[in-house]
Every structure is written in structure tokens, then in C-alpha cells.
Swiss-Prot record:
UniProt-recorded name of the protein: Ribose-phosphate pyrophosphokinase
PANTHER family: RIBOSE-PHOSPHATE DIPHOSPHOKINASE FAMILY MEMBER (PTHR10210), RIBOSE-PHOSPHATE PYROPHOSPHOKINASE 1, CHLOROPLASTIC (PTHR10210:SF41)
Catalytic residue list: 202
GO CC entries: cytoplasm; ribose phosphate diphosphokinase complex
InterPro entries assigned: PRib_PP_synth_CS (IPR000842), Pribosyltran_N (IPR029099), PRibTrfase_dom (IPR000836), PRTase-like (IPR029057), Rib-P_diPkinase (IPR005946), Rib-P_diPkinase_bac (IPR037515)
Pathway assigned in UniProt: Metabolic intermediate biosynthesis; 5-phospho-alpha-D-ribose 1-diphosphate biosynthesis; 5-phospho-alpha-D-ribose 1-diphosphate from D-ribose 5-phosphate (route I): step 1/1
EC numbers, comma separated: 2.7.6.1
Amino acid sequence: MLNNEYKNSSMKIFSLKGNEPLAQEVADHVGIELGKCSVKRFSDGEIQINIEESIRGCDVFIVQPTSYPVNLHLMELLIMIDACKRASAANINIVVPYYGYARQDRKARSREPITAKLVANLIETAGANRMIALDLHAPQIQGFFDIPIDHLMGVPILAQHFENDPDINPEECVVVSPDHGGVTRARKLADILKTPIAIIDKRRPKPNVAEVMNIVGDIEGRTAIIIDDIIDTAGTITLAAQALKDKGAKEVYACCTHPVLSGPAKERIENSAIKQLIVTNSIQLEENRKPNNTKELSVAGLIAKAIIRVYERESVSVLFD
């Protein structure tokens, strides 16, 4: 717990159904109780939200990742924003540890939508004044919004784990990006750990032929740490782990901020060359979706510090610069 000075302040932290344990942990760090609200569903699936205390003139923070089920959690968030606006909240800040639809951030083919932008429009139209986000899949999503975005980074939390793990010697490690798009993220982790980086270059020679993984960098005899922002079905990450082992990596660890872990992910990871999977609790991970070799780190402290700085009108950049 950081302090108790906000117990009787105008700060209110609310949780919806997306990740209640994380929201409770954030409130505990800040030193206040979660705001009282109820989230119910009618028999036809419609959502009903009732704020059970006055928030007039308050700075409201709504903690809600738009993770699985994405559409349900997104609608909960939009309805809660509207409820806060109609209840005369002074500022409506949304805390979105995982931003669903972020992977639809551009038109990959003709006649496709840019759903990440649509979601931004919906959030703004509903009435949010600010968003605190964590490791957006594409940083340029910040530009989809006209409201302020505080973009927090999960890399320092992951790095701290590897620095403190007695089984890992950073001097013998190499940080691996599973694709070209993740090089910046891998470089940040490598800079903290003071290790070299490697990149996996995936190429498909022709249609219906398996991808060939070429590894750019020296990994032989080293402990490889694969880092990504999202692990979904775990196909790419497990193939990458095997390719690293085949090329002489001593051990392979994998880490990510957002453990979506859908479909066959659990089985794939447990049966892969990955020694341990390190994730954060940005998404509430049910036990039946969590691989046995998973280590979960908390982002609650980071989010709590961001909330306090926003409430105090202080710079948030010190948390990620």
C-alpha cells in the first residue's frame, strides 16, 4: 500500500468485470476502497450498470481491460463511462491494461476496417477524458485518440524479474524478438539487462509451405529470452523457441505483457521448448488457460502510481522514460 492520504479524497476507483483482482490490488496500493457499482445482465444479454454512491465532482478511474470476452467487456466500459458522465463526475479516466482490437490498427487488405480507431471513437464519444494504457500493440494507436493517453510500459517489470531470478545470469542471455515488428521492445529489455539481441526472420517460401525461421544474431550456448507484447495462440512463440533450441540455445524463456492465451496456447506452451513463461496480470488468466510453467507478475503498483500522478496533476512520464 502506498499511502492512506487519498482515503477521503475525491478520487474514485471502479472495477467492472474485466479484471476485478487487478482493480482491487490497484485500489489497495493507492490506499482507498473500490467504488461501489453493480454490473448485471438482463436475460437477453443487455448490460445494466448502477453506480451505488455519489461521484459528483469526483475524479473517476475505471479499471477495465477489454480482453476476452472482448465485446462484452468493451460494452461494459462504454456504458460505465456514460453512467459516470450522467452522474456529473468531474473527470472520467479509463485504465485499460489490455486494449482489445489493437491488432486491427490498419488496413491489411482492401475493404477492411480499422477497428482500433473505431474503438477509440466509441470511447471518446461515450465521454472519457483520459486513458491510461499498458503496452499498446501499436504505439501509433495513441494517435487515434484526441484525449490524453498515458502509455505505460511493461518491459521494466519483466526486466526486474530476470535481474532477480537466481537461475538466470544476464551476462549469458540474449533477448530475442520473434519478428521484425518487436525489435524496439526487445531492444528496451536488452538495454536494461545489458545483453545482445537476436531477431527471428520468418519467411514463407511459397503458399502452403511451412515458414522458415532464420535467426539473426548469436544465440549458441546462451539463455534466450523471447519477448512479445501479446501471446495469443502461442504458435509463433513455440515455433521460435524450438528454432532457438535447434540453433544451440541453452535454455529458452518467453515473456509478454498480455497473456491472451486462447485456443491451443496452454497445450502448445507446456509441450514446447519454453522452460518458463513470464506474463503480467494485465489480463485475468483463468487457471484452465494458464500453462503449468507460468510465472505471473503484477502491474498493479505501476498503474497505482500512474493514477496518483494523474490525480495530482503531476507528470506520468517518469514512470516510462
